[in-house]
Regions:
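Histidine-anchored nucleotide/phosphate-binding helix
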Residues: 129-139
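Structural beta-sheet core signal
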Residues: 118, 147-149
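Helix-rich effector regions associated with P-loop NTPase G domains
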Residues: 3-4, 24, 54, 60-71, ...
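Canonical P-loop GTPase G-domain recognition
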Residues: 144, 151-206
């Protein structure tokens, strides 16, 4: 493969999946996704592509379809810079959340990420509970989480904030940045070696697009002012896009989120809150809910001032959220199975009737 392909992130993990390419296809990486339209990069340049009907039909869920960062098989149309995506290669990592809306389904936001920059602003956006939520998502993705505390120039409690965040994120790296200063943002380049793909995850207005623009050295993504009345930013990134740095590495910008709803992070929540999990082992009752039960080591730690009650509430809230989604998924699966059995029975009855004629 070409040096460009290696810089894009192609490696032995993906090569092993296609030792023999299907005739007329070539590997490519998804750079941009706009609804059902994609821009992909192959060894000979960029193509505009759509998903074949067969791939869409065979995909078990929306999460199985291509997203930015995916490696896919492309069937180009001869003589044109367009083609069809016929397959999605197995993902090495994936950043997922529960899709917005009432339906309980997985939404993959980006695939094959090596480093996930979790960005929060040191302004009205600063929220330890949100960082906990993002960290659980990062751990589940299998990407390396890196905490970025942006807008350090607007903060008067930087050292205090770093100490608070350290207590929450454990050993994950923490960096403070001023997105408008290329020198300040330069510390993030250490994570962006050739072939490495990094994504930025954070709520609206934390400065993700400005950080990427500083790393690129020019304004690739639009930025907007944060509203002073609420501290919230407007969505300036309307789609996900992968860009290649001239110095090596790849960056993915994602639209800002009002809320990140967790998806399948049961074990990861335990890892994020390992201090509470360790205390829970000392509770008198194995099924202790850390509420009013006697002999609760967790409540004792709160009462002694050793455990932040807000952290305990965050832990309990995330567990309730996961339990709700788990039950919703089970109910939906049962209804789907029941519907499938009914259809099979109707087909069976029709077959029997035809044979009796």
């Amino acid at each position: 493969m070409s040096d460009f392909f290696l810089q894009l992130g192609w490696n032995a993990f993906f090569a092993a999946q296609i030792r023999e390419l299907p005739p007329g296809t070539l590997p490519a990486r998804v750079l941009v996704q706009r609804r059902t339209n994609f821009l992909v990069a192959a060894h000979d340049g960029e193509y505009r592509a759509t998903v074949t009907g067969r791939l869409r039909f065979l995909s078990g869920a929306q999460a199985d379809l291509p997203v930015v960062g995916d490696w896919v098989l492309l069937r180009p149309i001869p003589g044109e810079r367009t083609g069809s995506i016929t397959a999605v290669l197995q993902r090495k990592t994936a950043v997922s959340r529960r899709a917005p809306g009432r339906e309980d389904v997985e939404q993959v936001m980006a695939a094959n990420i090596d480093v996930l920059f979790l960005v929060t602003g040191l302004d009205e956006n600063y929220n330890l509970r949100r960082i906990e939520r993002y960290l659980a998502t990062a751990i589940r993705s299998s990407a390396q989480p890196v905490i970025v505390l942006n807008k350090v120039d607007l903060c008067s409690f930087v050292e205090e904030a770093i100490a608070e965040v350290r207590a929450v994120v454990g050993t994950a790296p923490i960096h403070t940045t001023n997105a408008l200063s290329r020198e300040s943002v330069g510390q993030l380049r250490a994570y962006l070696a050739p072939g490495v793909t990094a994504a930025f995850l954070g709520s609206s207005g934390v400065g993700k697009s400005t950080l990427i623009n500083s790393l690129l050295g020019h304004e690739k993504f639009k930025t907007a002012e944060v509203r002073e009345d609420s501290g919230r930013g407007r969505h300036t990134t309307s789609h996900r896009e992968l860009v290649v740095l001239s110095s090596g590495g790849n960056l993915i910008d994602t639209p800002g989120m009002r809320e990140l709803q967790l998806w399948g992070v049961d074990e990861e929540v335990s890892e994020v809150f390992d201090d509470i999990e360790e205390l829970a082992q000392q509770c008198r009752f194995r099924d202790c809910r850390h509420d009013q039960e006697p002999g609760c080591a967790v409540r004792t730690s709160v009462e002694e001032g050793k455990l932040d009650p807000a952290r305990l509430e965050s832990y309990a809230r995330l567990l309730r959220e996961l339990d709700y989604h788990r039950r919703s998924t089970d109910i939906r699966a049962r209804l789907t199975q029941k519907g499938k059995e009914k259809r099979m029975m109707r087909q069976y009855n029709r077959t029997i009737k035809r044979k009796r004629r």
